[in-house]
Amino acid sequence: MRTNYCGLISEQYLGQTVTVKGWVHRRRDHGGVIFIDLRDREGIVQVVIDPDTPEAFAAADSARNEYVLGITGRVRNRPEGTTNDKMISGKIEILAKEIEVLNAAATPPFQIDDENISENVRLTNRVIDLRRPVMQRNLRLRYQVAMGVRRYLDAQGFIDIETPMLTRSTPEGARDYLVPSRVHPGEFFALPQSPQLFKQLLMVAGFDRYYQITKCFRDEDLRADRQPEFTQIDLETSFLNEDEIMDITEGMAKQVFKDALNVDLGDFPRMPYSEAMFYYGSDKPDMRINLKFTELTDLMKTEEFKVFRGAADMKGGRVVALRVPNGAKFSRKEIDEYTKFVGIYGAKGLAYIKVNDAGNLSNGEDSGLQSPIVKFLSENALKEIIERTAAQNGDIIFFGADKAKVVNEAVGALRIKVGLEHGKDNGYFTDEWKPLWVVDFPMFEYDEEADRYVAVHHPFTAPKEGHEDLMVSDPANCLARAYDMVLNGWEIGGGSIRIHRADVQGKVFAALKISPEEQQEKFGFLLDNLKFGAPPHGGLAFGLDRLVTLMTGAESIRDVIAFPKTQRAQCLLTDAPNSVDDKQLRELSLRLRQKAVETKEA
């Protein structure tokens, strides 16, 4: 019977006989004495086997990496000069008396301590990959976060209630994962994109405070921080306003960080959405980076430089500057790389001015400003740019000029890239946790392809008080009672006060050009129940995967999920998705128009 975990044996066990079980992490033969580093989920302990115990020695001699062993022996001090203060077990070793080979192991596809493994190899051999200490630490922290959330919400009076995994398909932005019904031929369930409507119905039912940690599913194009199935910390509460909900969830985030990382997050400042977009080009600004946009649209309306003037005059156009301290030393190669980078976001180029002498702002050949565009701008404009940006000698000023969406995304991404690459050495990056709330989101945004307004969050978000009439008369300026929790440039949680009156919900649907017939067909179960005395309610959902990725510093969200999908929504371990036989399809009343094609990742 095991008495101790390997990684938890310390000097307090000196002289005691212990039994440990785990995997051979490393085996070394030193002049007739065999050393085995035995590993389990808690860490590694060094085991010494000498020829005086012939049976144990023979077992150790036959063992190889990843063999599963049970070892009984006496705990003793390591010899002087061989200790490792970074490990709990670093000052002791076990002198083995008995060794039982519990299982042999084939040679693994990579060494457990190898850090240079391609992600595809890791995901194909995920079980072996999960043995690596970094993956064990990541998933242990994930567990600690989830348990911390449960403890906090339980103490706040929230009730854990499960909502259905098989539900009806409703439009919430992304495509649904559909599940054909065998019992009802030609009809489909959908896997939930979120428990949104069910948690609102739980409030109507009178449960007051609900939460669950649940799986959600979205069939969308994947990015580094997205998975087709993901885990959400979901909560909803009745009779509280947005300030009260933000206070509760902010307290939860602080408690989780304190318990898991011993980090004090401090207070969360609040920033209106309009301010976030104006200064940072993003609704999730990374406040570790002390760089801001400077608005130049008004200034460029009177300039002759076509690139800037055209953007300033176009409907929805924008011209901004981004001053980077000490950036004049950027090489031509670096600027070319940044130009290529902003092109990913639709920018057609990247204009810049290097400030060599802010006292000489002419646009002639002797100018203290170095740039191909200086000669196209008036001296008044150059002076105004320097004043507005507060540029100093040695700075560089980058420019974005295009539709506001392109400028915000391109220059916003450039701000992050430059800040992370050069900010620490030049005083505009602070390596600490920087949380905030982004509030006062627009209720709607215009979708040019669909030629109509769509909901920024979802169509169940309540308009800000006094903005209800704007839903019809001026939807572009209608604000929502929505709020996002942002941490170091990541949205880790988003929520809103919901619509609790059926008539107001109908107005929102009308503003979104959803007909009464479509409203009833898709959302009748919600509208019908809102009529039975629905309380004011609101909530928030955290992305657990994203939160743990931030807390661990993992490179990818896939490093904090036990069995993730690739960016092509495949599981390389199980080879899913896979084709099914015709009998299964017939039982579901389905016939494929196109057979499966080979798209598996190599």
Swiss-Prot record:
CDD domains reported in the protein's UniProt record: AspRS_core (cd00777), EcAspRS_like_N (cd04317)
Gene Ontology CC terms, in alphabetical order: cytoplasm
Task performed by this protein: Aspartyl-tRNA synthetase with relaxed tRNA specificity since it is able to aspartylate not only its cognate tRNA(Asp) but also tRNA(Asn). Reaction proceeds in two steps: L-aspartate is first activated by ATP to form Asp-AMP and then transferred to the acceptor end of tRNA(Asp/Asn).
Record-annotated site: Important for tRNA non-discrimination: 30, 81
Top enzyme class: ligase
Protein's organism: Neisseria gonorrhoeae (strain NCCP11945)
Entries under NCBIfam families matching the protein: aspS_bact, PRK00476.1
Protein name per the record: Aspartate--tRNA(Asp/Asn) ligase
SUPFAM superfamilies: Class II aaRS and biotin synthetases, GAD domain-like, Nucleic acid-binding proteins
Subunit structure: Homodimer.
Upper lineage: Bacteria, Pseudomonadati, Pseudomonadota, Betaproteobacteria, Neisseriales
Region (Aspartate): 196-199
Primary residence: cytoplasm
Keywords, alphabetical: Aminoacyl-tRNA synthetase, ATP-binding, Cytoplasm, Ligase, Nucleotide-binding, Protein biosynthesis
HAMAP family on file: Asp_tRNA_synth_type1 (MF_00044)
Binding site for ATP: 218-220, 227, 491, 543-546
Residue positions binding L-aspartate: 172, 218, 457, 498
Reaction(s) this enzyme catalyzes, per UniProt: tRNA(Asx) + L-aspartate + ATP = L-aspartyl-tRNA(Asx) + AMP + diphosphate
Any Pfam family hit: GAD
Location relative to the cell: Cytoplasm
MF terms in GO: aspartate-tRNA ligase activity; aspartate-tRNA(Asn) ligase activity; ATP binding; nucleic acid binding
EC number: 6.1.1.23
InterPro entries: Aa-tRNA-synt_II, aa-tRNA-synth_II, aa-tRNA-synth_II/BPL/LPL, Asp-tRNA-ligase_1, Asp-tRNA-ligase_1_N, Asp/Asn-tRNA-synth_IIb, AspRS_core, GAD-like_sf
Gene encoding the protein: aspS
